[in-house]
């Protein structure tokens, strides 16, 4: 609404909205905005700081590794029982990539070998079951022992069922085996169906379950079995983990590579029992067309443990500027972490290998000048 002044002097006495006044209003609005949104602004600043730290850390790390341009003469470990795994060394090896890819009954000793033109394979002794590889073990074992036996087969786990198709695939796989029940890789510590967890924390039953009526039931037990025969075939029940049952071990498919001893999930792992620092080991692996190993699942972590028969540590190709922040040297994203021991002043990541003992598979940070055995990893070309 317009304001009229009877006296011209009164008009002159009114405050004039100068540029400084408008600037003051802008400052006030900015102040109010910051006050109302300070949490979001602080979160953004922290994320930016973490990003800058990671970039600076990576730059300093590789600049510091320049002193390693001339690598020392590599000496093998004094542990005489260890065998140096060079890429070209394949004599007297078990060929883990001799496989079968046709679905067949596990009770039948014969199997159809894939033609040489097929590259998608299963490890030796495993059969293609849908999109995964399975090995039926016709030996009644308590659940813990069954899991241990599976681990001995290339780090495999007790089988999982994540959808209806996988249920049908498993029933077809064991239909002629004369088996009624199988241990699965599922454990339920509560009665709620969504509370169950697959082995090595590889998922839950939140998206799919096929429990029979009244299950899971912790009164019967925490371990889950798969029903093979009868009207309830394909459904799941609960049982004491000490109960004896047959079981199926599971591995992912991979790609044929006759030059690879340790072949898992379309990657080749090359073990070197020589002691280097992480910068030196990364350069060494690069010269072999690979990278220092990165790990992206609990299943992969489990597989790597089967490569080693020692008590000690191996280098991983990771840097940890923060407990929940790992940068892999091969540039792959961080989708999994088993970093249990983090030290602020130590940023290079190592893994304990202890042949099933305490801390087996645990990760921890250490000074980057420490020298240990290491594992290279390269993708297998399809």
UniProtKB/Swiss-Prot annotation:
GO molecular function: carbohydrate binding
Entry protein name: C-type lectin domain-containing protein 38
Lineage of the organism: Eukaryota, Metazoa, Ecdysozoa, Nematoda, Chromadorea
Any single Gene Ontology cellular-component annotation: membrane
Biased composition regions of type Low complexity, renumbered to the chain: 100-116
Annotated tissue distribution: Expressed in ventral cord motor neurons and PLM touch neurons.
Alphabetically ordered keywords of this record: Disulfide bond, Glycoprotein, Lectin, Membrane, Repeat, Signal-anchor, Transmembrane, Transmembrane helix
SUPFAM superfamilies, sorted: C-type lectin-like
Protein origin, superkingdom: Eukaryota
Coiled-coil stretches: none
SMART domains, A to Z: CLECT (SM00034)
